[in-house]
Amino acid sequence: MIDTVYGFGQGLMGGIWPATVWPVLWALIKIVCVLLPLMGCVAYLTLWERKAIGFTQIRFGPNRVGPFGLLQPIADALKLLTKEIIMPTAASKGLFVLGPIMTIMPALAAWAVIPFGPDIALSNINAGLLFLMAITSMEVYGVIIAGWASNSKYAFLGAMRASAQMVSYEIAMGFCLVVVLMVSASLNMTDIVMSQAKGIAVGYGLNFLSWNWLPLLPIFVVYFISGLAETNRHPFDVVEGESEIVAGHMVEYSGMAFAMFFLAEYANMWLVAILAVILFLGGWLSPVDWWLFNLIPGWIWLGAKTFVVVTMFLWVRATFPRFRYDQIMRLGWKIFIPVTLVWLVVVGAWMQTPYNIWK
């Protein structure tokens, strides 16, 4: 279908514009078609978070703006758009502006290689997983720059905490991705999903038992918890601990500059969740080979699984207390990294035996 639309547009525009115009215009259309729904999901994730936490605390959550509070994200966006951006007198102005930009850009650029179906992706490159590992590691620079440029000891302390935490858990997440790379034998995101469509359980119609979450369960657990820490989500949110340093590296920001950090955090939540679905939960594949399930489009399965993973993020926030900073560092360096290294060796040895299930 996408190829049909592209061919139609090329034929329509070919006689009007030079041949190089339509590919550029088509790329812009695809970017808009990904970013606009993403921004909508980010906005309404804030509402779902407040509603879900309200449910766990036996209260309603936002219910005043629009029916059932459905217009609350729009009201929040308008509030942030109309607020003044105040720059501290002693701040480094260029870096102060650059910090939020460098934080949100990797969170958006990473979606370029995320497949929403077998043939639905902005760029279906063979090194998609490598691109993701590289681009997401750039976000830590925005955090450091924001803390340094604010010329505030509170912002600087928050930036040091955030950067140390992000770097620590990036290592464990990187090893998790390497294990998935080993069993899939590909860096292509689509190939990783399709590699989960084969196995003994598939022959019995139980597709979900052939996905990577089961044989790589320890890696899946480490990835999920590391994703919480990487995005500075509860219970790893010491960066913006309300009782300590308020908003961490964002403490001197206001208006849309603050909103860009906010958007980056929630866009990263969606990114970590959809990556968990693609790498471990079969992506757009149906969990059971049943004719009724097979009628459901793959992108709906992908969205439903991603929504469940994101909801698990919110459930963790509603139920667990915040860890101390030393506990977070100990968990990352003394538990997660050794576990992923050991499992990397175990899976490598497993693949060399006659019991290799990933052939």
Curated annotation (Swiss-Prot):
Catalytic reaction list: a quinone + NADH + 5 H(+)(in) = a quinol + NAD(+) + 4 H(+)(out)
Disulfide bonds: none
Membrane topology of this protein: Multi-pass membrane protein
Known EC number: 7.1.1.-
Location, primary (coarse class): membrane
GO biological process entries: aerobic respiration
A GO term for molecular function: NADH dehydrogenase activity
UniProt keyword terms in alphabetical order: Cell inner membrane, Cell membrane, Membrane, NAD, Quinone, Translocase, Transmembrane, Transmembrane helix, Ubiquinone
Membrane spanning stretches: 16-36, 94-114, 129-149, 167-187, 208-228, 261-281, 296-316, 331-351
Any Pfam family the entry gives: NADHdh
GO cellular component labels: plasma membrane
Domain of life: Bacteria
Subcellular localization, as worded in the UniProt entry: Cell inner membrane
Function according to Swiss-Prot or TrEMBL: NDH-1 shuttles electrons from NADH, via FMN and iron-sulfur (Fe-S) centers, to quinones in the respiratory chain. The immediate electron acceptor for the enzyme in this species is believed to be ubiquinone. Couples the redox reaction to proton translocation (for every two electrons transferred, four hydrogen ions are translocated across the cytoplasmic membrane), and thus conserves the redox energy in a proton gradient. This subunit may bind ubiquinone.
Entry similarity comment: Belongs to the complex I subunit 1 family.
Quaternary assembly: NDH-1 is composed of 14 different subunits. Subunits NuoA, H, J, K, L, M, N constitute the membrane sector of the complex.
UniProt name for this protein: NADH-quinone oxidoreductase subunit H
Species of the source: Polaromonas sp. (strain JS666 / ATCC BAA-500)
